[in-house]
Curated annotation (Swiss-Prot):
The keyword Coiled coil appears for this protein: no
Source organism of the structure: Axis porcinus
Name of the protein described by the UniProt record: Sex-determining region Y protein
Similarity section: Belongs to the SRY family.
SMART domains in UniProt: HMG (SM00398)
Locations listed in the record: Nucleus speckle; Cytoplasm; Nucleus
GO molecular function ontology, one term from the record: calmodulin binding
Source organism superkingdom: Eukaryota
One Gene Ontology cellular component: nuclear speck
Pfam family, one: HMG_box
Signal peptide: none
Role summary: Transcriptional regulator that controls a genetic switch in male development. It is necessary and sufficient for initiating male sex determination by directing the development of supporting cell precursors (pre-Sertoli cells) as Sertoli rather than granulosa cells. Involved in different aspects of gene regulation including promoter activation or repression. Binds to the DNA consensus sequence 5'-[AT]AACAA[AT]-3'. SRY HMG box recognizes DNA by partial intercalation in the minor groove and promotes DNA bending. Also involved in pre-mRNA splicing.
Post-translational modifications reported in the UniProt record: Acetylation of Lys-130 contributes to its nuclear localization and enhances its interaction with KPNB1. Deacetylated by HDAC3.
C-alpha cells in the first residue's frame, strides 16, 4: 500500500491488477490526451494555412482612412461601420491633389516593400465556402428579371399563340359579353310579354265594350260595373 502511494510513475498493468475501475479511468485519460493533441496539431495546421495568405498592399485611400476611421469612430461611437465608410469616401473625394499626394507616396513605398518581400505575388481572392453561398440570399439580378417577366407576362406572345394570361382575359371578356347578351335578351322578352299583356287587356276591354249591348239584352239586371276594367 505504501509503495503504490509513493510511486509517481506506474504502468497500466499494475493499475489493472490493483483496481480495474482505476484502469478504465486511466485509459480514458490516455485517449482524451491523444485526441486533445490531435486537435492542437490540426489547429496549428489551420493557423499555418491561414498565415500563408498574403494581403494586398494598401492603396492611398486605405493609408489615409486607417487613421481617419479611428477618429470618426471615437467621435461617433454609435455610428455603424457602413456609415463611417460612406463618410470617409465623401471626405476623400473632397480632398485636393496636394492633400492626397503624401498618401500616394506612402502607398508607392509600401508597394515597393511588398514586391521585395513577395517577388512572385499574384492577387488571388479567397473563394467563398459552400456554406456561405447557401446562407446568401438569391441574386438580386435574377429576382429583378423574374419580377420583370411576371409584370410583362400578359403581353408576351410565343410562336403566334397568346399566353395563358391573355387567354384567361379573353375568356373572361367572352363570358361577360355572353352574360350581357343574355341579360338583354331576357329584358327584351320581359318587355315584350308586358307589352303583349297590356295589348291583350286593351283588346279584351274593347271587345267587351263593343259586345255590351248584347250582354245587356241577355241579362237585363246586369250592371255595367261588372264589365269595368
Amino acid at each position: 500500500m505504501f509503495r503504490v502511494l509513493n510511486d509517481d510513475v506506474y504502468s497500466p498493468a499494475e493499475i489493472q491488477q490493483q483496481n480495474p475501475l482505476a484502469f478504465g479511468k486511466a485509459s480514458s485519460l490516455f485517449t482524451d490526451n491523444r485526441s486533445a493533441n490531435d486537435q492542437c496539431e490540426t489547429g496549428e495546421n489551420v493557423r499555418e494555412s491561414g498565415q500563408d495568405h498574403v494581403k494586398r498592399p494598401m492603396n492611398a485611400f486605405i493609408v489615409w482612412s486607417r487613421e481617419r476611421r479611428r477618429k470618426v469612430a471615437l467621435e461617433n461611437p454609435k455610428m455603424q461601420n457602413s456609415e463611417i465608410s460612406k463618410q470617409l469616401g465623401y471626405e476623400w473625394k473632397r480632398l485636393t491633389d496636394a492633400e492626397k499626394r503624401p498618401f500616394f507616396e506612402e502607398a508607392q513605398r509600401l508597394l515597393a516593400v511588398h514586391r521585395d518581400k513577395y517577388p512572385g505575388y499574384k492577387y488571388r481572392p479567397r473563394r467563398k465556402t459552400k456554406r456561405q453561398q447557401k446562407l446568401l440570399p438569391a441574386d438580386s439580378s435574377k429576382l429583378c428579371k423574374q419580377m420583370h417577366i411576371e409584370t410583362l407576362q400578359p403581353f408576351i406572345y410565343r410562336d403566334g399563340c397568346a399566353n395563358t394570361t391573355g387567354s384567361r382575359m379573353e375568356s373572361q371578356l367572352s363570358l361577360s359579353q355572353s352574360v350581357t347578351i343574355t341579360n338583354s335578351f331576357f329584358q327584351n322578352e320581359h318587355h315584350r310579354s308586358w307589352t303583349n299583356l297590356g295589348h291583350n287587356r286593351v283588346t279584351l276591354a274593347t271587345q267587351i265594350s263593343a259586345d255590351f249591348p248584347f250582354y245587356q239584352s241577355l241579362q237585363p239586371g246586369l250592371s255595367c260595373a261588372y264589365f269595368q276594367y
